[in-house]
Curated annotation (Swiss-Prot):
Protein name (record): C4-dicarboxylate transport protein
Chain's gene name: dctA
Transmembrane regions listed in the UniProt entry: 21-41, 57-77, 92-112, 141-161, 163-183, 201-221, 232-252, 320-340, 345-365, 368-388
GO cellular component: plasma membrane
Purpose: Responsible for the transport of dicarboxylates such as succinate, fumarate, and malate from the periplasm across the membrane.
Organism: Granulibacter bethesdensis (strain ATCC BAA-1260 / CGDNIH1)
Family the entry assigns: Belongs to the dicarboxylate/amino acid:cation symporter (DAACS) (TC 2.A.23) family.
Subcellular localization, as worded in the UniProt entry: Cell inner membrane
Taxonomic lineage of the native organism: Bacteria, Pseudomonadati, Pseudomonadota, Alphaproteobacteria, Acetobacterales
One Pfam family of this chain: SDF
Length: 447
């Protein structure tokens, strides 16, 4: 899957002062908004448009992000026959464990029910569309849902922002662009340049996150009371515990079956994990992760295909988050979801998560994309969790990164392209650290 060129990967910068970190700014904004919502609820509710505006900004970039990520990724795989077997096996792995992550999140949130006592009023989500969701739930049929995935025109899909239509066209266009070979190279380069610009736009929009968090949290506390914060804290805790258990138990079992320790792997890629923790994004860690997987005995071809592709197709942390967050919103709004509704949510999340990028805020973008095609849950409901979403992004990115490291080793072993002795030596720390960028430029720019 095409990822950001080396030049796009953020380079080390001089240390920021503590108050310049986005994480700190969001934390301060949340603290102030909670105080305002508690002591002056009427005033706090007036700041709701700040959160609404930020959500609209996020929704604005959903379609281009998915289109460019999917098209450049598929088109970048030039020799389809050579890479087909590796990609096929990788996709089987991605499908199985992405589905498992979604199911795990679904099961946990049904058991814990972190939003059940919030009792938020859907009518107070400041959206006149809320009243249409019940009717849409009755009007939507399976056949109609499937037919609606096919857009009338490519332009209409992008203009309307229908995520499944955008994804459908993106996959077809990516395959077509890859099939024309060198004739498609100029267009691919243009799309990669445009992708860099869109990712930069995402970064720019994320600078407004403190204002959006302030507005969303102030409105939430002012409207629903301080008890809502307890529910949000429970949401964050539920997600973190679920992600940790998924890594240790599910991925740990996979690692043990394939002859290595998940804890040793985590220690081996600790520098990349710290980079992810500092940026809330798995993208900056891509070159280092690829270098380390090669050094750990995975063949370069497998690494160059599996890891970049996994950045869009193997997002375990994002998938866990999506089902937990979506059902939290439904529980908070007292919207009962049947098992059929939850199965639809799982299916849509499986598709929409394939357009998620490894950048800060992408999980929230993907959640908005998912809810936009689920008739029972108001998209405006994401405003309930926006204030704490920033504090779940690190866990999403960390889980995604670990999942892709495991995937590279498993697929390499599956293909017979893994040096087991080298893997053991690497995980036991028997040679020095590997630096990012060692013969990786070609992979990062064209995979």
């Amino acid at each position: 899957m095409a990822m950001a060129p080396v030049s796009q990967v953020p380079q080390p910068r001089r240390p920021h002062k503590w108050y310049q970190h986005l994480y700190v700014q969001v934390l301060i904004a949340m603290a102030l908004s909670i105080l305002l919502g508690y002591f002056a609820p009427d005033v706090a509710k007036s700041f709701g448009p700040l959160g609404d505006a930020f959500i609209k900004l996020v929704k604005m970039i959903i379609a281009p992000v998915i289109f460019l990520t999917v098209v450049t990724g598929i088109a970048g795989m030039r020799d389809m026959k050579t890479v087909g077997r590796v990609i096929g096996k990788a996709m089987i792995y991605f499908l199985c464990f992405s589905t498992l992550a979604l199911v795990v999140g679904l099961v946990v949130v049904n058991i814990v029910q972190p939003g059940a006592s919030m009792h938020a009023d859907p009518a107070k989500l400041s959206s006149s569309l809320v009243q249409t969701y019940v009717q849409r739930a009755h009007d939507t049929s399976l056949i109609g849902f499937l037919l609606n995935i096919i857009p009338a025109t490519p332009v209409s899909a992008l203009a309307s922002g229908d995520i499944l239509q955008v994804l459908f066209f993106s996959v077809l266009f990516g395959i077509a662009l890859a099939s024309v070979g060198e004739a498609g190279t100029p267009l691919l380069k243009v799309l990669e340049s445009l992708s860099a610009s869109i990712f930069r736009l995402v970064a720019i929009l994320m600078r407004a996150a403190p204002l959006g968090a302030f507005g969303a949290m102030a409105y939430t506390v002012g409207t629903f009371g301080i008890r809502s914060i307890l529910n949000l804290a429970m949401l964050v805790g539920t997600f973190y515990i679920t992600a940790i258990l998924f890594v240790l138990i599910v991925l740990g079992s996979v690692a043990r079956y394939n002859g290595f320790s998940i804890l040793k792997l985590i220690r081996y890629i600790k520098e990349e994990l710290l980079l992810v923790l500092g940026t809330s994004s798995s993208e900056p860690a891509l070159p280092g992760l690829m270098a380390k997987m090669e050094a750990a005995g995975c063949e370069k071809t497998v690494v160059g295909l599996v890891i970049p592709t996994g950045y869009s197709f193997n997002l375990d942390g994002t998938n866990i988050y999506m089902t937990i967050a979506a059902l939290f919103i439904a529980q908070a709004l007292n919207i009962p979801l049947s098992w059929g509704d939850q199965a639809l949510l799982l299916a849509v999340a499986m598709l929409s998560s394939k357009g998620a990028a490894g950048v800060t805020g992408a999980g929230f973008v993907t959640l908005a994309a998912t809810l936009s095609v689920i008739p029972s849950i108001p998209v405006a409901g994401i405003g309930l969790i926006f204030g704490v979403d920033r504090f779940m992004s690190e866990c999403r990115a960390l889980t995604n990164l670990i999942g892709n490291a495991v995937a590279a080793i498993v697929v390499a072993r599956w293909e017979g392209k893994l040096d087991k002795n080298q893997l053991t030596a690497a995980l036991n720390g028997e040679f020095g650290p590997v630096e990012a960028g060692e013969d990786l430029a070609g992979h990062v720019t064209t995979s």
